[in-house]
Amino acid sequence: MDKFTLPFPSGVLKNWPNLDDVDIVIRPNYGWVLNILPLESVEESSGVARTRIPASYPMVKVRWGLRDVNSNGTVWVENVLDALDEPGEWVLNTKEQKIYLWPHGEKPEDIEAPQLTELIRVEGAIDYDGPHDEPVRGLTFRGLSFTRGDRWPWEKERAGSTLQHDWEMFDRPTAMVRMRGAENIAFEQCHWFDSGGAGIRMDLHAQSNRVADSVIEHLGGAGIVLAGYGPGTKDVNRYNEISRNHIHHIGEILWHAAAVSVWQSGGNRIAHNLIHDVNYTAITVSGRISWTKEGRGDGWRTIRWKEVEQTGGEALLPKPGYRPDWKLRAPFLHGRNNLVERNEIHDVMQKLWDGDAIYISGTGGGNRVRENFVHDCLSENMCEGIRCDDDQHETIIERNVVLRNGGMGVGIAIKGINHVTNNFIVDSTPFFQHRGMISLEAVPVEGSIIQQNILVATKPGLRPFYLKNLTGPPDPRLGETKMDFNLYWNTTDPKWADAHLAAGRLEGVEQNSGLGEPLFRDPEKGDFRFKAGSPALKLGIEPVDLRKVGLRK
């Protein structure tokens, strides 16, 4: 089935007179994206509709996952009178030039219609195909409010000009504030709220810019987007700072929108933010690209093939069903050396699934995720607290606390060679199949350091570790990692980790790890310092002081 065709049950869709006004809202095939697609035609007799622009994937039920996520619906129709059934809803009929509104009170009040997606653009001279841009420099915006922007619609001719999984458009005016060719620009003590699209984005050439001490709330799209040039040698989106912002209720229209999205952008610092009530992932650092010239998949149009071929030679040319080795692609994946630290994140993954609090995937090395507090993400849709997804390497995940994680109850997952050290994963609360509190879900993992972590379970049946290559054999092995000096405790089963420790020791790892209550001072109140006599101290595990995390100077 193509990406324009939608079969439907009899009577659900109609060939409405104002069909151009009608949208289909759908989770197509996968649970990690939501599309809003205008209808082109409806054949009531055959039960087949077509949309004017393609979906991200074929428009069938969500089919991939550990459980059925279709029961609450995967496709809806919007902007038809048939669906106007509760206060606060409205329908626009452009043929009649009428708005139908069911008001909250006795009469309509404060009706506003946005006219712009962008309110401010800071733009230098962009030479898209050339090696250098001329940025605007040295502006500060302080104490401003931005609101009532519109959502930028998807564009048929720009399919493939997108970030990973179509979570955002590449180089488009989707945010109220946009920097494009900008350096040393600061937005301080500002407020983005009540808008249909994203809050602020930094496109292409964006360096040493700062968004700080601000509030970003109730947006239809993403909170903050950093998106550099596609894979190539032009690496000019970097060294930006996102700090001390309160970001919440994000993705209220486009559910997949992240609070902070970093794509092909490196050396950034994302720190001391408070992020909550997000329908999908809180923070993404990504470089996932369909490495193809065939016109299929995520972001394929963004690849700067002339630069890649001049630098990488034949090894990087696309072949059917082939993705070049990460080490060959890494020089062109500019999402490297980012620092994600001391953020507080809770109540994410409210509607979509297969997402996380912090997500790193398919991008460059040197990213560091440290001293973040991820807690009370108890949505049934939750996957991992922190995840290195497909083909992600050289990431350091250290000194994080993951407390009360729902969904699969997984604290940290890696797919690749990454380091997981001195993290505390406590009180996992899985709603369905539990993989493990730490999961190794792909190969290779040789050389991964997994040391000085504390895993505390309060329920029976949980696993400390899960080792499974989710794309097929061979599976990762404990002995391929440098795994040791970890502490395990289950309040209901003192022998909980015995089998894991025995298996690890047979493979030459976990020689010094052990069982024991870590003696946190007050974990219920977020105090993960140790009491005197904690066995963690003998293992060289350091306490994590959450007083330094979140909205702090």
Language model: regions and residue ranges:
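Acidic, glycine- and Ser/Thr-rich low-complexity intrinsically disordered tracts
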Residues: 40-45, 52-59, 64-86, 91, ...
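Extracellular beta-strand-rich solenoid/capping regions of secreted or surface-exposed proteins
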Residues: 112-139, 168-183, 202-204
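Extended Gly/Ser/Thr-rich low-complexity repeat segments
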Residues: 10-31, 59-84, 107-125, 136, ...
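Right-handed parallel beta-helix
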Residues: 137-148, 183-194, 207-221, 235-251, ...
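Autoprocessing Asn-cyclization modules and mimics
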Residues: 1-53, 58-59
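Short glycine/acidic-rich loop motifs that flank beta-strands on beta-rich extracellular proteins
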Residues: 150-156, 174, 196-202, 220-226, ...
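N-terminal catalytic cores of secreted or lumenal carbohydrate-active enzymes
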Residues: 156-164, 169-171, 179-181, 194, ...
